[in-house]
């Protein structure tokens, strides 16, 4: 007797299932990982989404929760497993897993613990998806992007740190709020190391091509009577404030990662301030990753925009590079 399926559906052609073209994997299903996953699904940037974590129950629960929203999504396949074989043939892999800093722990010790975690994660990613682009989100992101590059053996253009893409978005939002315009209409960049020592590029900050420096030569400096410099301090402090209020940050970084992924999968050639190898740029001689304006397309970082920076901005970039290198040079097993 024919089944309901056989009575309902008549096969016209036996088509072999093809490999996904835009498969995205998210490693780590914590608050940040799931915000990335949700933003990727909402933007319809993947034809398959894979989730990986060591916590099997949470992993299965998150997958089920997303699958139950399938009617509202355009990503047909969502899979999850602690085994990295589930990530096979990924075009992009987003790494959000990592150790959190413990009270009183040195930055070097935190990074070394993350090296040990990444030594398990990164080779597995490359084993199953040797042609992927890796986006590192885990903090400290610039050092962990360097570690990922070293452990993966991938060319530098295919290892990207989320870097200052979010810092710049926060900067644009806060500056636009003060000016009474939409965030997308203020053009400004934060470069260098993600976080406390990031570098606001006041020399290029503009609205409709009108540089703020041309209106106030002291903008962003200690001599500025309008104290625009305080906006960058708010950008740096904002993550701490959110963590104080809700315990973690996740939505904005999730949206930021999805923004980067859109440029990659759609081959857009958009410019993003993301973490990339900066050796031999701006007088930096060490192998460190910092955020510079990068053109992103389907191969990863296609090129870097050579921004003309003020002398003090270059000095701050070099200082960031020196700080990172002083930690990296003492790492073991990289």
Swiss-Prot record:
Keywords: Cytoplasm, NAD, Oxidoreductase. It catalyses: (S)-lactate + NAD(+) = pyruvate + NADH + H(+). Its EC number is 1.1.1.27. Pathway: Fermentation; pyruvate fermentation to lactate; (S)-lactate from pyruvate: step 1/1. It is an enzyme of class 1 (oxidoreductase). HAMAP family: Lactate_dehydrog. This is L-lactate dehydrogenase B chain. It comes from Polypterus senegalus (Senegal bichir).
């Amino acid at each position: 007797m024919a089944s309901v399926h056989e009575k309902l559906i008549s096969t016209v052609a036996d088509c072999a299932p093809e490999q996904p073209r835009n498969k995205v994997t998210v490693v780590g299903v914590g608050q940040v990982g799931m915000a990335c996953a949700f933003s990727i699904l909402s933007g319809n940037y993947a034809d398959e989404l894979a989730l990986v974590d060591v916590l099997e129950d949470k992993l299965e629960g998150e997958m089920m929760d997303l699958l139950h929203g399938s009617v509202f999504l355009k990503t047909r396949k969502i899979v999850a497993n602690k085994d990295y074989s589930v990530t096979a043939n990924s075009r992009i892999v987003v790494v959000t897993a990592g150790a959190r800093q413990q009270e009183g722990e040195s930055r070097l010790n935190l990074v070394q613990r993350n090296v040990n975690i990444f030594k398990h994660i990164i080779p597995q990613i490359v084993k199953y998806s040797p042609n992927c682009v890796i986006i590192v989100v885990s903090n400290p992101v610039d050092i962990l992007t360097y570690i990922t590059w070293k452990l993966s053996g991938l060319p530098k253009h295919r290892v990207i740190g989320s870097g200052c893409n979010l810092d710049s978005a926060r900067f644009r939002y806060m500056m636009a709020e003060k000016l009474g315009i939409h965030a997308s209409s203020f053009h400004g960049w934060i470069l260098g190391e993600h976080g406390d020592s990031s570098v606001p590029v006041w020399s290029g900050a503009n609205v409709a091509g009108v540089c703020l420096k041309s209106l106030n030569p002291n903008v962003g400096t200690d001599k500025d009577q309008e104290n625009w410099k305080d906006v960058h301090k708010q950008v740096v402090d904002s993550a701490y404030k959110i963590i104080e209020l809700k315990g973690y940050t996740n939505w904005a970084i999730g949206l930021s990662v999805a923004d980067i992924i859109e440029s990659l999968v759609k081959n857009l050639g958009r410019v993003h301030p993301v973490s990339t190898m900066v050796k031999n740029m701006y007088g930096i001689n060490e192998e460190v990753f910092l955020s510079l304006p990068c053109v992103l397309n389907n191969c990863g970082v296609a090129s870097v925009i050579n921004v003309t920076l003020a002398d003090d901005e270059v000095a701050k970039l070099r200082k960031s590079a020196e700080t990172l290198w002083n930690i990296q040079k003492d790492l073991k097993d990289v």
